[in-house]
């Protein structure tokens, strides 16, 4: 029996919606990354994007455990000498709700063209409304 390998044009993608209210950031991010990659499907193939579309609502209500609201830091650099910027999780959630989740999921996906295609299937919204009702997403409980 030959090993099955999925073809990109044969992959069927579902739409799922996750309510992130009072959920822990890392637990949501790891499940989202798993489903974006397609590892929950029996036809998973490492070199083919077999993942589903994921909509995360209420991203502004994500939680972290312990003191990470103040202690977890995100860094970025302008490219100039001494141009490093640092932001805490609390400030990031206040200013850009959902960006912390996007960064967490992006770090869990492969680096390269396949990973970039996977992250495009993630839709994050700070509030409970989203414009994807036409796709009839199924509720996914984490």
Swiss-Prot record:
- GO molecular function term, any single one: structural constituent of ribosome
Give a Gene Ontology cellular component term annotated to this protein: cytosolic large ribosomal subunit
Keywords noted in UniProt: Ribonucleoprotein, Ribosomal protein
Q: State the oligomer form and interacting partners.
A: Part of the 50S ribosomal subunit.
| Native organism taxonomy | Bacteria, Pseudomonadati, Pseudomonadota, Betaproteobacteria, Burkholderiales
UniProt cross-references to CDD domains, sorted A to Z: Ribosomal_L13
- InterPro entries recorded: Ribosomal_uL13, Ribosomal_uL13_bac-type, Ribosomal_uL13_sf
**Primary gene name:** rplM
Which one GO biological process term can you cite for this protein? Answer: negative regulation of translation
Similarity-based family: Belongs to the universal ribosomal protein uL13 family.
Q: What does this protein do?
A: This protein is one of the early assembly proteins of the 50S ribosomal subunit, although it is not seen to bind rRNA by itself. It is important during the early stages of 50S assembly.
Against NCBIfam families, the record matches this protein to:
rplM_bact
Record's protein name: Large ribosomal subunit protein uL13
């Amino acid at each position: 029996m030959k090993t099955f390998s999925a073809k990109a044009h044969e992959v069927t993608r579902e739409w799922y919606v996750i309510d992130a209210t009072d959920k822990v950031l890392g637990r949501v991010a790891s499940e989202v990354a798993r489903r974006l990659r397609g590892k929950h499907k029996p036809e998973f193939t490492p070199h083919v994007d077999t993942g589903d579309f994921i909509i995360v609502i209420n991203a502004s209500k994500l939680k972290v455990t312990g003191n990470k609201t103040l202690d977890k830091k995100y860094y970025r650099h302008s490219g100039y000498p001494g141009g490093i910027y640092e932001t805490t999780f609390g400030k990031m959630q206040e200013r850009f709700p959902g960006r912390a989740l996007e960064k967490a999921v992006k770090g869990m996906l492969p680096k390269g063209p396949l990973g970039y295609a996977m992250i495009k299937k993630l839709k994050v919204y700070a509030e409970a409304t989203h414009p994807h009702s036409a796709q009839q997403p199924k509720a996914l409980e984490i």
